[in-house]
Swiss-Prot record:
Keywords: Cell membrane, Membrane, Protein transport, Translocation, Transmembrane, Transmembrane helix, Transport. The chain crosses the membrane at residues 13-33, 383-403, 408-428, 439-459, 487-507, 512-532. It comes from the Bacteria. It holds the Pfam family SecD_SecF_C. This is Protein translocase subunit SecD. It is a multi-pass membrane protein. The keyword Transmembrane helix applies. Part of the Sec protein translocase complex. Interacts with the SecYEG preprotein conducting channel. SecDF uses the proton motive force (PMF) to complete protein translocation after the ATP-dependent function of SecA. One of its GO terms (biological process) is protein transport by the Sec complex. It is found in: Cell membrane.
Length: 571
């Protein structure tokens, strides 16, 4: 047991909390959008809904298994970004994503197919906006394409998991032969044409796009590259549906360059992990990739054999990065840096997140964002806050009646805990997209109640020391030594329960568990850095040692009676 006579550096403890408090609020007021308001969930302020329509290369309906897998992957992406309170549901052949706030791009990005391929660059052209390639260019103007050697990694087809692609039939359907002429005066029956099938039409467009942009003929490849260089600002119908075993003519994400790429050498399913961070060799941010062992060997052999050449990283059929290989890259690690402009912290984190959880088994066409009204609204928020305020007031009233001045210290500690939790919630909403819903508010209220329990444990240990005959001044440090183990153990159990809920539960239960765990950690911070030093300072005051101020008169009376009984027994 620690000695009760050890020096107490109360000034150091209070200074540490003050630095933490000021630092958190400086970040809240001076960074980001500088709005010191927590990000509220869908149930309190509404959100944005985007419907993702599944599209398959052959025009068939998506399977339930593929939709369920896509739902799970998108849910993992949501959790990876820290976006709480979001909803991902299957609605027929569609996925409906609802996120808090009014940023529709966030919901669309969560539904990104994220099919990553690494392809060697064969040729490139700068984008020529406003110009169309002239049809019928003479063959003599074709550039000298680098021939693909037999040992090139892209020359041998590699197995990839992809949807089967069917080409539309080029043979027209035979016309029905009439069996007889219409009688005079009769109106010939005209068969109404069947309504066009949008899925079949889309499948035909994708198939035609593949024939044009993924041809193995050099002349067609050149025309496709020229065409792409003048149409990079158009929507890509092929997005996420390119065949990795064939060449590809496509554009960069910044729409400044068109590229002709060789077949893929590594696919995104060979990524073991992906993280984001600052670019140590330039500006902006990068995405760090760690390949699986088989892909790491392929990458090492390829980079060693192609020093000085360009290699493209394509995401959903667009080039996101075109690094030059300067040396052999061993260990299975590489980086993706953005184009012009470079990745920001948000875009790098988002790309790393979608690559970490894998590509979707389907490609989706997002709809326009729709505003969703709050399911509960600010009235429920106000009711929850009022309920919390009433409960907190009752706790403070009980503390003042039972502990007197120590109750005031309890109130001050709870104020410190509540204000720092508020600032942290603002920062979490700003940087990891955490949203506070009604379940999260319930977790906050219960967590603050746990903080009050810690004060009660401390004060009751002080009473136990006084019953044993010690003065208020000597009872405080001894009571703290006995109480802190109980406080740490109790908070550890609460935090463990919150952690289990957060990792195993879904939906709003995760928000409840998160705020409960957060307040549990801050409970320890406040008790150790605020409550304990303040109570120790109070024990040094002769005024606060009086029973009328500390509420310990009854306990001190019990101690005097015990001492008197002990003296009588010895006499």
């Amino acid at each position: 047991m620690a000695s009760s006579s050890a020096p107490v550096h109360f000034g150091r403890y209070l200074s540490m909390f003050l630095v933490l408090f000021i630092g958190v609020y400086l970040l809240a007021f001076l960074t980001g959008d500088k709005r010191v308001v927590p990000r509220l969930g869908i149930d309190l302020q509404g959100g944005t809904r985007v419907t993702l329509t599944a599209r398959t290369p052959d025009g068939s309906r998506p399977s339930r298994e593929a939709l369920s897998q896509a739902q799970q992957i998108i849910s993992s992406r949501v959790n990876g970004l820290g976006v709480s309170g979001s909803e991902v549901v299957v609605d027929g052949d569609n996925l409906v994503i609802t996120v808090p706030g009014n940023d529709g791009n966030e919901a669309r990005n969560l539904g990104q197919t994220a099919r990553l391929y690494i392809r060697p660059v064969l040729n490139s052209l700068p984008v020529q906006r406003g110009q169309d390639p002239k049809p019928g260019s003479p063959a003599g103007t074709l550039p000298n394409f680098a021939p693909m050697p037999p040992d090139h990694p892209g020359a041998q087809p590699r197995p990839y998991l992809q949807d089967p692609t069917s080409s539309p039939s080029s043979d027209p359907m035979p016309s029905p032969v009439p069996t007889g002429a219409a009688l005079p005066g009769e109106v010939p029956s005209v068969e109404q044409p069947a309504p066009p099938d949008p899925r079949k039409d889309l499948a035909e467009r994708i198939a035609e796009e593949k024939k044009w942009r993924q041809s193995t003929k050099q002349s067609i490849q050149f025309l496709a590259l020229q065409f792409e260089s003048t149409h990079c600002d158009k929507d890509d119908i092929l997005a996420g549906n390119d065949d990795p075993n064939l060449p590809l003519a496509t554009c960069s994400t910044d729409h400044n360059m068109a590229y002709l790429l060789a077949p893929s050498i590594i696919s995104g399913d060979q990524i073991q992990n992906s993280t984001s961070g600052m670019n140590q060799r330039g500006v902006g941010y990068v995405v760090d990739l760690q390949f699986k062992s088989a892909a790491a060997d392929v990458w090492a052999d390829f980079t060693a054999a192609h020093i000085g050449t360009q290699t493209a990283f394509t995401l959903d059929s667009e080039v996101v990065s075109v690094p030059v290989i300067n040396e052999a890259i061993l260990g299975g690690r590489t980086q993706i840096s953005g184009g012009d402009p470079p990745f920001t912290a948000a875009t790098a984190r988002q790309l790393a997140n979608v690559l970490k959880y894998g590509s979707l088994p389907l490609s989706f066409e997002p709809s326009e964002a729709q505003t969703v009204s709050a399911t509960l609204g600010l009235t429920s928020l106000r009711a929850g806050l009022i309920a919390g305020a009433i409960g907190l007031s009752l706790v403070l009233l009980y503390s003042l009646l039972y502990y007197r001045v120590l109750g005031l210290l309890t109130a001050f500690s709870l104020f410190c805990s509540g204000t720092i939790i508020f600032a942290i919630l603002v920062l979490l909403g700003r940087y990891i997209n955490y949203t506070l819903d009604l379940a999260g508010i319930a977790g906050l209220i219960i967590g603050i109640g746990t903080t009050a329990d810690s004060f009660v444990v401390f004060f009751e240990r002080i009473k136990d020391e006084i019953r044993e005959g010690r003065s208020f001044r000597s009872a405080v440090p001894r009571g703290w030594v006995r109480a802190r183990k109980t406080i740490v153990s109790g908070n550890a159990v609460t935090f463990l329960a919150a952690a289990v809920l957060h990792f195993l539960a879904i939906g709003q239960v995760k928000g409840f568990a998160f705020t409960l765990g957060l307040t549990t950690i801050l409970d320890l911070v406040v008790v150790f850095l605020v409550t304990w030093p303040l109570v120790y300072l109070a024990s040094k005051s002769p005024l606060l040692a009086r029973p009328a101020y500390n509420g310990l008169g009854a306990v001190q009376q019990v101690a005097r009676e015990r001492r008197a009984s002990a003296k009588t027994g010895r006499g």
